[in-house]
UniProtKB/Swiss-Prot annotation:
GO terms for molecular function: DNA binding; DNA-binding transcription factor activity; zinc ion binding. The keyword DNA-binding applies. It is found in: Nucleus. A motif (Nuclear localization signal) lies at residues 146-153. InterPro entries: C2CH-3rd_BIRD-IDD, C2CH-4th_BIRD-IDD, C2H2-2nd_BIRD-IDD, IDD1-16, Znf_C2H2_sf, Znf_C2H2_type. It comes from Arabidopsis thaliana. Zn(2+) 1 binds at C161, C164, H177, C181. The modification Phosphoserine is found at S72. It holds the Pfam family C2H2-2nd_BIRD-IDD. It comes from the Eukaryota. Its main location: nucleus. The gene is IDD12. A zinc finger (CCHC-type) spans 186-209. One of its GO terms (biological process) is regulation of DNA-templated transcription. This is Protein indeterminate-domain 12.
Length: 402
């Protein structure tokens, strides 16, 4: 019994909450709709206040009963149809001549029109057959108007403004322009002047777009310069001029038969001058030293780039006869004295591959003074005694081969 009462109480409370929530939702919906209605009404009011301007009707809508007159270009542009006998000034219409005669105190008379002639109007068509005003339905009702139209659209522009170099076909247009030229100019940031605001706005939009595009291209190019491709950063080895001068006195050589694996060691970040000298001499020892290596030193030796010896994985070289160096083998960067102790490093590359010290005199003189002697001069038996003394004096022992 108690449970049924509690259940009914819960159901009633839930229905009350649901009705309250639905009422709140309805109220919020009404408020949102009223706000949306206000927005729509404000937008409609704004559009009503800014209605587009009504376009001007096309010129030339004559009376159907008007008289259509077609004049030739020569007659239309004639300025001396009616000439004053006093000053020889020409006029296109007789009435203008009669009015001009009053200034000379001459008798003048205007042509009187009756009532019927006044009621009938005259319209003029353009002599140009391709023009829209050539059709009678688009004829112009004024002789001066058709004359200016023909000059502006189909005539020669012979009136020039001295300030802005603009040309005009009608003198009245030229005079009106000269009065305001330079007083109402619109200047763009690029330096161009405009006398009309609409042309200035059109040009300004195009000029701004062009400036943004050029700025974007400039920023892209500058970012590429400041952040180069990281793949090429590890292949460039930098060293100072003092260390590079250490290798200019004695040239280094490398042959085409060298294995690229021997030169594929990763470059170090920075080396001192002593380390560079040791590395260069070790490379020289592998190139020139050793009794079992086949070498040939001629007059057509070519220098290789020291920078590429020190870490660049591309070796540029040329040789007078590459077949002479086919048997060259690179064993390493350093060689040891081939004695029993093997504790002393040979940085000058004076040892060979055997157990004895094997030095060629030409190598010693090359390292000492940078003077290259032809090997053929030391291959004969006549020079054995002269260089044997030099070896004994230096303290080298063992069998050597001349």
């Amino acid at each position: 019994m108690f449970s049924s009462h509690s259940l009914s109480y819960k159901l009633s409370s839930l229905s009350t909450e649901a009705s309250a929530s639905s009422g709140n939702n309805t109220l919020s919906t009404i408020q949102e709709f009223s706000g949306f209605h206000n927005v729509i009404s404000s937008v409609c009011t704004h559009t009503e206040t800014h209605k587009p301007k009504k376009k001007r009707g096309l010129p030339g809508n004559p009376d159907p009963d008007a008289e259509v007159i077609a004049l030739s270009p020569k007659t239309l542009l004639a300025t001396n149809r009616f000439v004053c006998e006093i000053c020889n000034k020409g006029f296109q219409r007789d009435q203008n001549l009669q009015l001009h005669r009053r200034g000379h105190n001459l008798p003048w008379k205007l042509k009187q029109k009756n009532t019927k002639e006044q009621q009938k109007k005259k319209v003029y068509v353009c002599p140009e057959t391709n023009c829209a005003h050539h059709h009678p339905s688009r004829a112009l009702g004024d002789l001066t108007g058709i004359k200016k139209h023909f000059c502006r659209k189909h005539g020669e522009k012979k009136w020039k403004c001295e300030k802005c170099s603009k040309f005009y076909a009608v003198q009245s247009d030229w005079k009106a322009h000269t009065k305001i030229c330079g007083t109402r100019d619109y200047r763009c940031d690029c330096g161009t002047l405009f006398s009309r605001k609409d042309t200035f706005i059109t040009h300004r939009a195009f000029c701004d777009a062009l400036a943004e595009e050029s700025a974007r291209l400039h920023s892209t190019s500058s970012s590429n310069l400041t952040n180069p491709n990281p793949n090429f950063q590890g292949h460039h080895f930098m060293f100072n001029k003092s260390s590079s001068l250490l290798f200019t006195s004695s040239p280094l050589f490398i042959e085409p038969s060298l294995s690229t694996a021997a030169l594929s060691t990763p470059p170090t970040a920075a080396l001192s001058a002593t380390a560079l000298l040791q590395k260069a001499t070790s490379l020289s020892s592998t190139t020139f030293g050793g009794g079992g290596q086949t070498r040939s030193i001629g007059h057509h030796r070519h220098l290789t780039n020291v920078n590429e010896f020190l870490g660049v994985d591309r070796v540029m070289m040329t040789s007078a006869s590459s077949s002479e160096y086919d048997q060259l083998v690179v064993d390493g960067f350093t060689s040891t004295w081939q004695k029993a102790d093997r504790l002393t490093r040979d940085f000058l590359g004076l040892t060979g591959h055997g157990g004895h010290v094997s030095v060629r005199p030409g190598d010693m003189l090359e390292y000492a003074g940078g003077v290259a002697f032809p090997m053929s001069a030391y291959d004969t038996e006549s020079h054995d005694h002269s260089f044997q003394k030099a070896y004994d004096h230096l303290g080298f022992s063992g069998a050597h081969r001349m």
